[in-house]
Amino acid sequence: MGKMGGSRHLKSLAAPGYYPIAKRERVWVVKPSPGPHAIDEGIPLLLIVRDMLKLATTAREARRIISMKKILVDGKPRYDYKFQVGLMDVISIPEIGVNYRMVPDPHRFLRLIEIPQSESKMKLVKVIGKRTIRGGRIQLTSHDGRNFLLDGRDVKPGDSLLIELPSQSVIDHLRFDTGSSVLVTRGRMAGRIGRVEGIGTIIEMRDLENPELSYRGVKENLIVVGKERPVLKLR
């Protein structure tokens, strides 16, 4: 979880480089609220509404749209214009019938892709923590700050869960294993989807779209998105 103290404002020159703003035109930029995504892993909702989706031309217009609870993130209305939207989050605007997923990009770090209505209530989350709690139950923590209590599932950190939104009921468990499809989340290959060919300190992958292309990465920068093919639209 990202927490920031000090000023309630953020100078545009100090903002993450991937923010969709013209830094020379704006002195200040909205400072994200503490939430499930760190400051360098998400984009405030106001910037998404105004600068990415072009639903408003000014910050005031964007705040008004958000305050009217017209924007859903992961199936829930969000009225805090500073709310951070990050990797794999789903944005829905029921009034105009459009849905988007936040995916990695090699140049902009994060970008939105439009997704079908049938996928608007599904999300992939990466398991980043696992511990046993009272009663012997297993608690899992995901990359977006969610907690899951599961019995009888051999889920490991690095695996992914396909969940239903907003209930976060688990639909499927995707293991990080040889043959799994993984999405690269950082680096020059960010946004590419590869099939795992070798697992060690470095993960060996072969691109799904271009089998002649192979690349390597670390597990921390990968998220399992399917067994043989991605279970959701990611490109």
UniProtKB/Swiss-Prot annotation:
The keyword rRNA-binding applies. Keywords: Ribonucleoprotein, Ribosomal protein, RNA-binding, rRNA-binding. GO terms for cellular component: cytosolic small ribosomal subunit. It comes from the Archaea. It holds the Pfam family S4. SUPFAM superfamilies: Alpha-L RNA-binding motif. Residues 43-114 form the S4 RNA-binding domain. One of its GO terms (molecular function) is structural constituent of ribosome. One of its GO terms (biological process) is translation. Belongs to the eukaryotic ribosomal protein eS4 family. This is Small ribosomal subunit protein eS4.
